[in-house]
Amino acid sequence: MLEQEQASYRVERINELIRRELTLLLRTSIKDPRLRDMIITDVLISRDLSSAKVFYTVIKEDKKMIEPLLDKASGFFRIHLSKTIDLRHTPVLRFIFDSAPNTGARIEQLLSKL
């Protein structure tokens, strides 16, 4: 049981580290202004650390415009992560739009009208 808890803790720590590094990268190194309005909401790495789902939301831009940009930049993100995070293999990143923040804002807007 202890080994499983340690493995789970390690995965959570890596998730947070990847989220933090990608957020920093978006704020400091990405020149495309459309990607600067993006927020990384969560990262879920697989147990074998080979792939990671990166959940994001956007403030101003249309998500359909952002998805191809993220797919194109995923190699750049992986290279950066390989230099900053000490892992045997850098995970393959898959970006997934997170609609939860938008849904929450819509619910708040509807409740304020009551």
Swiss-Prot record:
Monomer. Binds 30S ribosomal subunits, but not 50S ribosomal subunits or 70S ribosomes. NCBIfam families: rbfA. GO terms for molecular function: ribosomal small subunit binding. One of its GO terms (biological process) is maturation of SSU-rRNA. HAMAP family: RbfA. It is found in: Cytoplasm. GO terms for cellular component: cytosol. PROSITE patterns: RBFA. Keywords: Cytoplasm, Ribosome biogenesis. PANTHER family: RIBOSOME-BINDING FACTOR A, CHLOROPLASTIC-RELATED. Pfam families: RBFA. One of several proteins that assist in the late maturation steps of the functional core of the 30S ribosomal subunit. Associates with free 30S ribosomal subunits (but not with 30S subunits that are part of 70S ribosomes or polysomes). Required for efficient processing of 16S rRNA. May interact with the 5'-terminal helix region of 16S rRNA. SUPFAM superfamilies: Ribosome-binding factor A, RbfA. This is Ribosome-binding factor A. Belongs to the RbfA family.
